[in-house]
């Protein structure tokens, strides 16, 4: 009888140790070892965390990137920088690396711009043929349009999906803000 009780207790203990705790399960995807989104900018990391708490759309984008081979580096430029721009960096060891550079905006607009650019990263994740800058341009000529309003040098592309995503995340943030 005692040995059966001890065996059950040991089994329960093993299950508890082998199963991630609720706090670990709730751990932010941006803190996971295979972080799909990285930044050295504390403000951008904090805004991403805030956006993930509030926006189901942003959470879906990050989850999709987490399941992909795309790694995104976020950077914030000073005044006069681009509103937002994704640049293909490299394909190495089974991963595709992109950099998103954004201007500095107010909190909600910054999160919405981040979502807009992360939608572009998802578009790359959904297209395995994008492996370098030229293949990125070819794909965006197919799925997007030239952004005539861009003040950046060179050709800047955009997609309706990215525009809609940024708008949707901004709506979600404004609804949450209005509930306070």
Where in the sequence are the language-model features?
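Bacterial N-terminal signal peptides
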Residues: 10-21
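Catalytic Zn2+-binding segment of zinc metalloproteases
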Residues: 118-134
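A metal-dependent hydrolase signature that marks the N-terminal structural subdomain at the beginning
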Residues: 2, 21-92
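Metalloprotease/metallohydrolase-associated module, dominated by Zn2+-dependent proteases
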Residues: 53-62, 67-88, 108, 135-180
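Active-site scaffold of zinc-dependent metalloenzymes
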Residues: 77-109, 121-124
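A conserved beta-strand element that flanks and buttresses the S-adenosyl-L-methionine
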Residues: 114
């Amino acid at each position: 009888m005692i040995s059966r009780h001890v065996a059950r207790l040991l089994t329960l203990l093993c299950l508890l140790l082998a199963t991630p705790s609720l706090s670990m399960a709730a751990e932010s995807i941006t803190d996971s070892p295979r972080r799909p989104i990285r930044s050295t900018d504390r403000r951008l990391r904090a805004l991403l965390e805030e956006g993930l708490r509030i926006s189901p759309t942003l959470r879906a984008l990050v989850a999709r990137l987490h399941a992909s081979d795309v790694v995104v580096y976020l950077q914030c430029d000073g005044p006069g920088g681009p509103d937002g721009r994704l640049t293909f960096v490299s394909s190495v060891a089974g991963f595709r690396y992109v950099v998103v550079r954004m201007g500095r905006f107010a909190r909600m607009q910054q999160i919405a711009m981040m979502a807009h650019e992360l939608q572009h990263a998802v578009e790359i994740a959904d297209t395995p043929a994008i492996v370098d800058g030229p293949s990125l341009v070819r794909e965006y000529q197919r799925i997007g349009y030239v952004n005539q309003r861009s003040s950046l040098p060179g050709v800047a592309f955009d997609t309706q999906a990215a525009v809609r995503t940024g708008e949707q995340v901004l709506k979600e943030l404004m609804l949450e803000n209005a509930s306070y």
